[in-house]
Amino acid sequence: MGACDIVTEANISSDIDSNATGVTAFSMPGWQLALWATAYLALVLVAVVGNATVIWIILAHRRMRTVTNYFIVNLALADLCMATFNAAFNFVYASHNIWYFGRAFCYFQNLFPITAMFVSIYSMTAIAADRYMAIVHPFQPRLSGPGTKAVIAGIWLVALALAFPQCFYSTITMDQGATKCVVAWPEDSGGKMLLLYHLTVIALIYFLPLVVMFVAYSVIGFKLWRRTVPGHQTHGANLRHLRAKKKFVKTMVLVVVTFAVCWLPYHLYFLLGHFQDDIYCRKFIQQVYLVLFWLAMSSTMYNPIIYCCLNHRFRSGFRLAFRCCPWVTPTEEDKLELTHTPSLSVRVNRCHTKETLFLVGDVAPSEAANGQAGGPQDGGAYDF
């Protein structure tokens, strides 16, 4: 690829053609730059405030500290960091075609975005796996608190390892007086290495986890909506519990679909560049990239909105978090939603070969956090 790398994001750059002397000037009118800056600023603010609030709601209230919610915290943290460190700085780079932030941040910028995206989608995958075990195999041992922390740490370590090659080959170059942050793959096989690496990354951080989640939620949906136990009718607390499960699954499916839709055009854009690399030299491509990059980064701000709209506890949490706003009036019920722990009752269902626990309310936070074995014991997680 030549020097036309303006809209290849810093962390997805190509090899350097040291003999290239021409450079494509990408500029836009001031009013257009102001509109883009406003759009990206709004995105960052909504994502940072929303995800920070989600983290506070879960960590500050003992009732919310379930295994599933710890994965949601991990997802929110990754999205918050993605919006803060990737959206803002890469917008500046893409809109000016000059790297202002130094060599150290160039390394970081080629390491962190892939890391954060991997953490985001595999946190969603972990939630799908946890729900699969709870609903499809309710009597199998569940993740404990230490086990959950180990999974989260493992996700971050694998993500860093996957992103390391780009960081390793990162460098700062000068192109006719303009500073660029690029990834300089080895000259003898740079094009092949770049394509292979991008295909591997896209497969691991997009297609593979989406397939896993599709299968998991399909089986869960079949279990909840199709499967019935002969002679057993769901009513009362059990019916509420079943409805909570269904609502949780719908919420997480919406989160996954939103992520997939936001990121697909962005991945296709870079795959297209491998087979038609002169497209990056065309004037219109800057605007195309800014649209696709905004769409991809916007995935970081939708989850808090989805939680608030579809889950009453998160809605109560948001009202408490923004109670200083004159148009927000939290109630005592909002406080109880996040602090009160309903009682637990037990009875035996003779339709099964094993004794089954049925919840009147939610499981105690300590039990949920410790991931006690048995499906019904994670009842609180279905309601977040």
From Swiss-Prot:
GO annotation terms (biological process): positive regulation of flagellated sperm motility; regulation of uterine smooth muscle contraction
Extracellular side: 1-32, 91-107, 171-196, 273-290
Pfam families according to UniProt: 7tm_1 (PF00001)
Keyword GTP-binding assigned: no
GO molecular function, one term: substance K receptor activity
Parts of the chain on the Cytoplasmic side: 57-69, 130-149, 219-251, 311-384
PROSITE patterns in the cross-refs: G_PROTEIN_RECEP_F1_1 (PS00237), G_PROTEIN_RECEP_F1_2 (PS50262)
Keywords annotated in UniProt: Cell membrane, Disulfide bond, G-protein coupled receptor, Glycoprotein, Lipoprotein, Membrane, Palmitate, Receptor, Transducer, Transmembrane, Transmembrane helix
Signal peptide: none
Membrane topology annotation: Multi-pass membrane protein
Lipid-linked residues (S-palmitoyl cysteine): C324
InterPro entries referenced in this protein's UniProt entry, alphabetically: GPCR_Rhodpsn, GPCR_Rhodpsn_7TM, Neurokn_rcpt, NK2_rcpt
Matches recorded under CDD domains: 7tmA_SKR_NK2R
Intrachain S-S bonds: C106-C181
Localization: Cell membrane
Stretches assigned to coiled coil: none
Residues passing through the membrane, by range: 33-56, 70-90, 108-129, 150-170, 197-218, 252-272, 291-310
Keyword Lipoprotein: yes
Listed SUPFAM superfamilies: Family A G protein-coupled receptor-like
GO CC aspect terms: plasma membrane; sperm head; sperm midpiece
Residues of this chain annotated as glycosylated in UniProt: N11, N19
Biological function: This is a receptor for the tachykinin neuropeptide substance K (neurokinin A). It is associated with G proteins that activate a phosphatidylinositol-calcium second messenger system.
The family this protein is said to belong to: Belongs to the G-protein coupled receptor 1 family.
Entry protein name: Substance-K receptor
Species this chain originates from: Oryctolagus cuniculus (Rabbit)
Gene name as annotated: TACR2
